Amino acid sequence: MDDTLQYYDQHAKAYVDSTRDVEFSQTQERFLQYLEPGARILDFGCGSGRDTKYFRNRGFQVEAVDGSAEFVRIASEYTGINVRRMLFQDLDEVERYDGIWACSSILHLPCAELEVVLGKMARALRRRGIVYT
């Protein structure tokens, strides 16, 4: 995972430039249709902050995390919220979120760690919570 984080730290600007304006609202809305207005969402591996900002603009409570220090800086600036630097393996919340949005993020996990992280994600969800990955 360190190589992945190093890559994103070094190429964050190029990644943001190529993805921030991608039209993604149809997929985002499909996720949101299962949530109550104002629900709490974790943007798990938020990258540029594009989706965090979209969800906040739609009235949802959003917490955003990323393992890349550069993405944390960029996303915090773009969204106006305090994005936390955190590895997927460090998720320890219990029944905190109504939805977890893990768009193009947990695919970077080694297979050996995926089951553990999916279990942590399930534990972090409230009853009837949903995940997008």
Show where each model-derived region lies.
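Conserved class I S-adenosyl-L-methionine
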Residues: 1-36, 38-47
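A short SAM/SAH-binding and catalytic strip from SAM-dependent methyltransferases
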Residues: 99-113
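Class I SAM-dependent methyltransferase SAM/SAH-binding core
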Residues: 48-90
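Conserved beta-strand signature within the Rossmann-like core of class I S-adenosyl-L-methionine
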Residues: 128-133
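A short glycine-rich, Lys/Arg-flanked "PGG" loop and its adjoining helix->strand segment in the class I
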Residues: 115-127
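A short acidic, Gly/Pro-enriched loop at the edge of an enzyme's catalytic core
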Residues: 89-100
